[in-house]
Amino acid sequence: MPIIVRSAEVENQAIGTGVTTQSLLSPKNTGSDNVLLDLITFGNGAALDLTLKADTFGWLQVVDGSGSLAGYDLHLDPDGVTYLPLGYVGAFTAATDGTRLLMATVPDAVRFDSDVAETPSELRTTDWSREPVLQSEHDERTRIYMATRTLTGTSAYRGEMIRYPSGTQAPAHHHEGAEHFQYVLKGNCTALLAGKTSQLSAGDVLYNYEMEVHSFLNDSDDEFIFVEFFVPGGCKTVWAPGASPCAWLPTGADIMGRPPSRDIGYHVHGEEKGI
């Protein structure tokens, strides 16, 4: 069965001066070490060493606030997702009080990318607000890629942002070959998980194992937005009988209506080679 973690109910643990963390995903609650996920909260000017083990890489997403990584000249804010290379050494310093940082790590990353030794050794930040917005062919959802092999240099994980306008529903489906999680950024929805309904709200995490049938209905008045990450990045998507495969069409714009930083053509979910 999928696992729902409500961050509002997870204990905050102090791990430094002005820094607390909440363990959202770990082997303790998922039974899996494909991906570990922590939500870290900082006071203004507080810093935390984010050094990774030699066999581990990961990524960061600022949920609220802003900050910087030591030796990296790019300021980090909620518009970016930053790839942390294998064995990264460095610290994050918050620029505002209440900065929240979503940090995911993939231990023993060679399990998911046999060419892990060839992955980029430098930090990489994807400004998702400049990435192309893709429109679902059969409903009102939109998608923005946040992490792909093209963007990060590895196929060990893949990330995207999905937006559901009010009243939007996607068909039931499951994935084969990867586990994945959704972190809700905004809004509420009804999730249909293995035939049972559950409510998801901002701050919740849904962890899906392989073969878990799931779908979402935004039955609220506001937009429902989540980010989802697959480990490994490549997997097969199987749609429920009678459902149309989820295909995505280019809109020719980024989330602000500007020309996007690159072009992505029509494709079906699960066939994202080269994206």
Residue ranges and their predicted role:
Residues 135-177, 185-188:
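Surface-exposed interaction/gating patches
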Residues 1-34, 98-100, 104-156, 241-275:
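A short, N-terminal "cap"/entry segment at the start of jelly-roll beta-barrel domains
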Residues 92-96, 216-220:
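Asparagine-centered strand-capping/turn motif at beta-strand->loop junctions
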Residues 72-87, 195-211:
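Short acidic-glycine-tyrosine-enriched beta hairpin
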Residues 39-42, 52-68, 161-165, 174-191, ...:
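Short, conserved beta-strand element in jelly-roll/cupin
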Residues 21-26, 36-53, 147-148, 160-175, ...:
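Conserved short histidine dyad/triad with adjacent acidic residue
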Residues 39, 83, 97-113, 207, ...:
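A short hydrophobic beta-strand segment most commonly corresponding to one strand
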